[in-house]
Amino acid sequence: MPSHGERKNKDIECNIWNGIHDLECIWKYVQCNWDRIYLYACSIGAYFSLHAYKNRNIEKYLFLSPILDMDYLIHNMFSWFDVSENELKEKQKIETPIETLSWKYYQYVKDNPIKHWDIPTDIMYGSKDILQSIEIVRHFSMKFNCQLYIAKESEHSFMSDSDRKIVTDWIEGSI
């Protein structure tokens, strides 16, 4: 993903357009090499996948700590970092400790909500996730008939020793 892992210090913004571009490159490779495709995505990767792969022949999605409602997250960032919508519109981009807020990206989010999703999807959500509320995740799961698993005491990152087993068991039970 842009600005993640080995690309963390590269000059590539983590936004929907770069995310979709990367996922399209991956898709070209995957579709040529496999007949049955399952997708595993975490956090922002899940959000990008919802947009990049919505019309792709994928058997099942596995989303770990997915960002399902980017508008919700952006509004939380407005609150966390004392930024207003008008200020973002005026400045176009505002740096925060988490990520750069962009007016163009915000407009994309507002103009492109996920309205249709009919691909079988399993979601693992940590009860201590602060990036998406349980209400957001439950609403998405109910609206689009997804299987929702909630890990008590897990955070967005699922990085504790006990989380490894939770995630491994969930993946094995979902495929």
Model-inferred region functions:
Residues 13-32:
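Alpha/beta-hydrolase active-site loop
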Residues 30-35, 117:
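Glycine-rich phosphate-binding loop signature in dinucleotide/nucleotide-binding domains
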Residues 36-41, 64:
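Short beta-strand immediately N-terminal to the catalytic nucleophile in serine-hydrolase-like folds
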Residues 57-139, 143-150, 154-158, 162-174:
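The alpha/beta-hydrolase serine catalytic core
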Residues 9-15, 78:
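Short glycine-enriched, charge-decorated loop/helix-capping segments at active-site entrances
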Residues 52-53:
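Aromatic pocket-lining residues of Rossmann-like dinucleotide-binding sites
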Residues 40-49:
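Gly/Ala-rich beta-loop-alpha elbow adjacent to hydrolase catalytic centers
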Residues 1-9:
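Conserved alpha/beta-hydrolase
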